[in-house]
C-alpha cells in the first residue's frame, strides 16, 4: 500500500484499525531536538476517540510508545518509530460487511485492489484511526517548527450548513477553545448540527481552515515540487478529505485579476503583500505571508440509516444497516490531523532549503 510520504522527510504509516497496534516511522528528522512528550500527548488527545458526545463512543488512550529514534529524550538522527496499541476493538461488528461493501467506504475498492485479502475490521488500513500516527509525526514537526517561530493552527470553518464567518488570522484567537471556532454562537449551532445528525442516525461533514504563520519566503519549488503539491498530498492522506484549496481557492475563479492580485509593499524593511488571496504561495514557492488552506471533509459514511448495497458473493442487491461505533461528524477530531499534515509538509520544505545542519537545535 502507498502509505509512505517520501521527501527530505520520510514518513511511513503502518497498522490497521483493529490490529494489535498502529504506528509511524519518521526518517530525516534533525538530531538533537528535545521532544516534549507532555505537549505531544495533549496534541494526540485532541484527535483521540471517545472524548466527547460529538464523537465515536470507542475509547482509546492513544499513548505513543517510542521504539527507537530518541536518546535522552532527544532525536538522535536514527529513524524514529512509535506505535499506539489498539486496546478497544470489536471486530465482530464488521463480520457482516466482508461480503457487503458499505456505501461511501473503501470496502469495495479494497476488495477489487487486494482480492479479498484486505483487513475489513474497522476499515483496516483505510481507517481514520491511521491519522493517530500521522499526528505523532506532525506533532513532533510542529514542535520543531514552533522553536523556529513557525506556528500552525486550524479551526472549524463549517459543519454542514453552519459557517463561522469570522476571519481567521492565526492561533491567538483560538487559545483555550475546546471546540476550535472563532464565533462561539456559530460553534454552538455546529455542535447542535452534529447532535441532530446523530439523533437521525445520519452524519454530517464540514470544512477545516488552517493557517501557518511566520513561514520563510522561498520554500518550495515550481510545478511538481510546489508547496501546494506537498500540502495537498499530505492533506489527502486524511481519509475523509475530498477537497483542498489555498488562499481564495475556488473563489478566485469568480474574481477579476485586479481583485485577486495581492499588491506588494514594504513593511518593517521586508516585502509583504497587502492581501493574501494567494494563500502565501506563488509559483509553488512561499511568499513569506501566512499559508492559508482549507480541507473539505465528507460526512462519515458509516451511518445507522438503511442503505442499498450489493452482496459480492451472491451478486444480489441487499439492504445494509451499519453496526459499530462511529463519529456523526469527523471534523472536530480532524482539526489536529490537518495541523499535522501541514507541519510535515512545511518542515520537509525547510529541510530542503536549509538542510538538517541549518535547522539545528543543539
Which positions does each model-derived feature cover?
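Short acidic, glycine/tyrosine-flanked loop/strand segments centered on an H-E-D-like triad
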Residues: 98-124, 308-326
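Glycine-rich anion/phosphate-binding loop at the beta-strand->alpha-helix junction
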Residues: 14-20, 135, 201-204, 208-317
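Glycine-rich, N-terminal phosphate-binding loop and its surrounding beta-alpha-beta segment
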Residues: 44-103, 107-109
Amino acid at each position: 500500500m502507498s502509505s509512505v510520504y517520501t521527501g527530505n522527510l520520510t514518513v511511513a504509516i503502518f497498522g490497521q484499525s483493529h490490529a494489535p497496534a498502529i504506528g509511524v516511522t519518521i526518517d530525516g528528522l534533525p538530531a538533537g531536538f528535545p521532544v516534549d512528550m507532555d505537549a505531544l500527548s495533549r496534541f494526540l488527545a485532541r484527535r483521540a476517540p471517545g472524548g466527547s458526545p460529538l464523537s465515536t463512543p470507542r475509547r482509546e488512550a492513544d499513548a505513543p510508545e517510542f521504539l527507537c529514534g530518541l536518546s535522552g529524550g532527544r532525536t538522535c538522527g536514527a529513524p524514529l518509530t512509535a506505535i499506539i496499541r489498539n486496546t478497544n476493538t470489536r471486530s465482530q461488528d464488521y463480520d457482516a460487511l466482508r461480503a457487503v461493501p458499505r456505501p461511501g467506504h473503501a470496502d469495495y475498492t479494497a476488495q477489487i485492489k487486494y482480492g479479498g485479502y484486505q483487513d475489513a475490521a474497522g476499515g483496516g488500513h483505510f481507517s481514520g484511526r491511521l491519522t493517530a500516527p500521522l499526528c505523532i509525526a506532525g506533532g513532533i514537526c510542529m514542535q520543531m517548527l514552533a522553536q523556529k517561530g513557525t506556528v500552525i493552527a486550524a479551526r472549524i470553518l463549517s459543519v454542514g450548513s453552519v459557517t463561522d464567518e469570522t476571519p481567521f488570522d492565526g492561533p491567538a484567537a483560538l487559545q483555550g477553545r475546546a471546540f476550535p471556532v472563532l464565533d462561539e454562537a456559530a460553534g454552538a449551532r455546529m455542535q447542535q448540527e452534529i447532535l441532530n445528525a446523530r439523533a437521525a442516525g445520519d452524519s454530517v461533514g464540514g470544512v477545516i481552515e488552517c493557517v501557518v504563520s511566520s513561514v520563510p519566503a522561498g520554500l518550495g519549488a515550481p510545478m511538481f515540487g510546489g508547496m501546494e503539491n506537498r500540502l495537498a498530498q499530505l492533506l489527502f492522506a486524511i481519509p475523509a478529505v475530498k477537497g483542498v484549496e489555498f488562499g481564495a481557492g475556488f473563489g478566485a475563479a469568480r474574481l477579476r485579476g485586479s481583485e485577486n492580485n495581492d499588491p506588494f509593499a514594504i513593511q518593517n524593511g521586508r516585502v509583504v503583500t497587502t492581501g493574501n488571496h494567494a494563500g502565501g504561495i506563488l509559483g509553488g514557492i512561499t511568499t513569506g505571508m501566512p499559508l492559508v488552506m482549507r480541507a473539505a471533509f465528507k460526512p462519515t459514511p458509516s451511518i445507522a440509516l438503511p442503505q442499498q448495497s450489493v452482496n459480492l458473493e451472491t451478486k444480489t442487491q441487499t439492504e445494509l444497516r451499519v453496526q459499530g461505533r462511529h463519529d456523526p461528524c469527523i471534523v472536530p477530531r480532524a482539526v489536529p490531523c490537518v495541523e499535522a499534515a501541514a507541519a510535515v509538509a512545511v518542515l520537509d520544505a525547510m529541510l530542503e532549503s536549509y538542510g538538517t545542519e541549518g535547522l539545528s537545535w543543539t
